[in-house]
């Protein structure tokens, strides 16, 4: 598992979760 992918996922996932759950 590449550290770069982990870094990108760490930045993108919170935004996706925020949009889906509507909890920002």
UniProtKB/Swiss-Prot annotation:
Location in the cell:
Secreted
Note the SS bond partners: 18-24
What GO cellular component entries does it have? Answer: extracellular region
Provide the primary localization: secreted
Source organism superkingdom: Eukaryota
Listed Pfam families: Antimicrobial_1
- Which UniProt keywords are listed? Amphibian defense peptide, Antibiotic, Antimicrobial, Disulfide bond, Fungicide, Secreted
Q: Name one GO biological process term.
A: positive regulation of mast cell degranulation
Keyword Cell wall biogenesis/degradation assigned to the entry: answer is: no
Tissue occurrence: Expressed by the skin glands.
Signal sequence residues: none
User: Per the record's keyword annotation, is Secreted included, yes or no?
Assistant: yes
User: Family, per the entry?
Assistant: Belongs to the frog skin active peptide (FSAP) family. Brevinin subfamily.
Q: What does this protein do?
A: Antibacterial activity against Gram-positive bacterium S.aureus and Gram-negative bacterium E.coli. Has activity against C.albicans.
Spell out the protein name for this chain.
Answer: Brevinin-1Pa
| Species, as recorded | Lithobates pipiens (Northern leopard frog)
